[in-house]
């Protein structure tokens, strides 16, 4: 018997030597923004679930494992999801077996109580090592997790962009976002003691190829993190909506990001031997229409879609006056509806000035109850609010261009926070919040992403410092109307007074 046991131990030892490296497959998504539902053209969580489940079956046969991660911004983008506080998104990720997600800045679009509800629904870790409570100090959610796979372990540290402090500050409350790199350096020794492989699940943004936003806050990007920090094996990133078709390697760190809107899913295959990555490969897989949708995920998310669609008919406010969005009117003069839209843009972002193009306003709202569907008819393009940092001189350039626009053009400018007189194709007597404009002062100006990119001839705005909030203009108007409750009267206020009409 003893001889038999000795032979058995010897065989096990020999097999372990020649067993080869362990196989770990990592699937990752980011910036899905409410796109839980696919279309006939592809995309959606149900198709992603099919690929993940297939890999689980295949890898299990060889004794490997699958890790599924999301790099943040589950929230905000599709009305049917937004109406339901992204509950269908988080439930779908739960049933898809998501192991963890990092917090994205759009997880703070709504009151903190909503995020807490989403956490309860999700039943998977929300990672954010640098999202801390200012009063008690320390992270609000889990800073990291350790996944033990028997022969090896993986540590996952979550980080959220410091940009959140200027992008979505309203609902941070007594919490804040602290320096991502400093936080990572604090947790790395702890995680390295417990794990063989270290992954940073980050919502920081990748800007190694340029396009780094110019903001009034210091922030870290994933490429900078890879360059500056040692001891990290992989950074799975989000926030910049970058499609890295194959991961890039920076300072021996694998950096991956999979685009946005659930159009793709990233896959990284690792082979791990003796606690080290000995080989890897990575790709981004487009979720094309030929990938079948997982029937369970599709079934229950379709039911939520119906609920969300019905929610579009829910009343968000009441107006006792006709809100004028007639094409001929908003392309020639300010109206009560254009003023309402611009006021809502300031209310949502805290900007000093709002700029809105008349061509973006596509319908009126009759007196009576206002539904979200009504609002989407007024603002149907899905444009997002874009905040720029403009000097007084920059604003004068905008106004002087607007002063040359003849009636009937979509570039007709509507404003909030600002008044001016237009005469002879020039803007004069310009005041911002009642005070004369200071040409050297920098102002916070909100417009939509179309105008910010130079649309409708506002080319002087293209390339100016600023950032996309990813707040849909329709959502901003909906929330502002809900805030007002009942619109008793919303008259035109002659914000841009045309002393001579440009025809």
Curated annotation (Swiss-Prot):
Pfam families tied to this protein: 5_nucleotid_C (PF02872), Metallophos (PF00149)
Signal peptide start-end: 1-19
Keywords: Hydrolase, Signal
Superkingdom, natural source: Bacteria
Reported regulation of activity: Divalent cations are not required for activity, but the presence of Mn(2+), Mg(2+) or Ca(2+) stimulates activity.
Annotated site location: Transition state stabilizer: 106, 109
Class of enzymatic activity (EC top level): hydrolase
Record field: catalytic activity: (2R)-2-O-[alpha-D-mannopyranosyl-(1->2)-alpha-D-glucopyranosyl]-3-phospho-glycerate + H2O = (2R)-2-O-[alpha-D-mannopyranosyl-(1->2)-alpha-D-glucopyranosyl]-glycerate + phosphate
Positions annotated to bind substrate: 327, 362, 381, 450-456
SUPFAM superfamilies: 5'-nucleotidase (syn. UDP-sugar hydrolase), C-terminal domain, Metallo-dependent phosphatases
Temperature dependence of activity: Optimum temperature is 80 degrees Celsius.
Job of this protein: Involved in the biosynthesis of the compatible solute mannosylglucosylglycerate through a phosphorylating pathway. Catalyzes the dephosphorylation of mannosylglucosyl-3-phosphoglycerate (MGPG) to mannosylglucosylglycerate (MGG). Can also dephosphorylate UDP-glucose, ADP-glucose, GDP-mannose, glucosyl-3-phosphoglycerate (GPG), mannosyl-3-phosphoglycerate (MPG), ADP, GDP and UDP.
Family: Belongs to the 5'-nucleotidase family.
Protein name, entry field: Mannosylglucosyl-3-phosphoglycerate phosphatase
